[in-house]
Each structure stands twice: as C-alpha cells, then as structure tokens.
Regions:
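Small/polar loops that bind or transfer phosphate-bearing groups
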Residues: 2-3, 26, 56-57, 103, ...
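Metal-dependent phosphodiesterase/nuclease catalytic metal-binding core
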Residues: 86-174
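Structured loop/turn residues at beta-strand edges in well-structured enzyme cores
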Residues: 16-19, 78, 97-99
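Residues that form or flank phosphate/diphosphate-binding pockets in enzymes
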Residues: 2, 32-35, 64, 110
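Active-site neighborhood of divalent metal-dependent phosphoester bond hydrolases
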Residues: 49-86
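Alpha-helix N-cap/helix-start and coil->helix boundary motif
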Residues: 8, 18, 31, 61-62, ...
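Active-site metal-binding motif and surrounding structural segment of the metallo-beta-lactamase
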Residues: 5-56, 84-86
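Conserved beta-strand hairpin/beta-sheet module of binuclear metal-dependent hydrolase folds
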Residues: 1-20, 50, 115-117, 124, ...
Length: 174
C-alpha cells in the first residue's frame, strides 16, 4: 500500500521480494505516497520481471506514470495495468479468495481514498472424526462448514453440533 521514495529500501529491509508483488495500491497523489513507484517498477523491469502487475490508484495516476516513463525513456519488460478509482464513492478494487480490497473516500487536500482490506468469512471447522463416524457425505460436510443446517437421512443437522465456529473475519484500514 503506497509507494513513497523509500519503498525499495523498505521492501529489502523486510526481506520482501519485488518480483512477488501482485498489486500496488496508491491512496493519493502526494509525493510521499507515489514518488517511489516509477523506480520500483523500473527495478522490477531491470530484474527481468515478466508477470503483469496491477496498480490501483487515483485518477491521473496512469497519465503521470506514462509521462514519467516517457521523460526518462523507460521501457517496462512486463505489463502494468493501472486501475483508477473514484474519490467520490466506496468501490471494490480487488477481490481474491480470502480478502477484498475497497476504496473509502476520505477528506484530504487532494482526492484521496483510504484502503480497507476485508477478510472473507472463514469456514467453520468440522469435527472430521465425528463426521466420518456418522458417514456424512462430502456435500453435507461442505454445507456444515459453511455454517448451513442441512437435512441428511431424515435428520436435521445443525453446524454448531458438528463444527466449531471460526474466529471473526478481520479488516484493516489504511
């Protein structure tokens, strides 16, 4: 999240590999949040990155990046997909298997969004031995793990009798 001037150093100090980054999220166009982005992307290219990367950020981010690359005659070895969000509405920016990222408009001197990472609800933990002993088929086990009551062989099975509830889904706001 965000890419100020020290982003490469911060990634190295925290033993994060540049090439493993799948996405970059920019909150607003102030220098301390964006000036490290061209250098980070250029370093990835110099290191031979081939995999595309997605960048979510405010309007004009893509034009700024293209202008910067043009000024220094930079050529990326990989595709850069810029997705610009609106500073006026909550938007789902990215959805993955285990989390969702949303933009949340906030007041600032320039268009700005906070970023909220929301963990999806976790499945219930099934007592596997109990389910096996009862001969529960796969589809019944899956329903119980989703927290859904289900009928099986004339019985109404309730998830709380077969599973332990998951911890509450977490969220992080930046």
């Amino acid at each position: 999240i965000d890419a100020g001037e020290g982003v490469q150093l911060a990634l190295r100090n925290n033993k994060r590999r540049f090439q493993k980054l799948k996405g970059i999220f920019i909150s607003h166009m102030h220098g301390d949040h964006v000036l490290g982005l061209p250098g980070l992307l250029s370093t990835m290219s110099l290191l031979g990155r081939q995999e595309a990367i997605d960048i979510w950020g405010p309007q004009k981010l893509e034009a700024w990046l293209r202008h910067t690359w043009g000024s220094i005659q930079a050529h990326m070895s990989f595709e850069v997909n810029v997705h610009e969000w609106s500073p006026h509405e909550v938007q789902t920016l990215h959805e993955a298997d285990h989390y969702r990222l949303r933009s949340i408009p906030i007041k600032h001197r320039i268009p700005c969004c906070g970023l909220r990472v929301e963990e999806h609800s976790l499945p219930w933990k099934l007592n596997g031995q109990k389910a096996q002993d009862a001969g529960l088929p796969f589809h019944v086990r899956q329903a119980l793990k989703r927290g859904e009551p289900i009928g099986f062989e004339g019985r109404d099975l309730k998830p709380e009798l077969w599973c332990t509830q998951p911890r509450k889904a977490r969220s992080y706001v930046y």
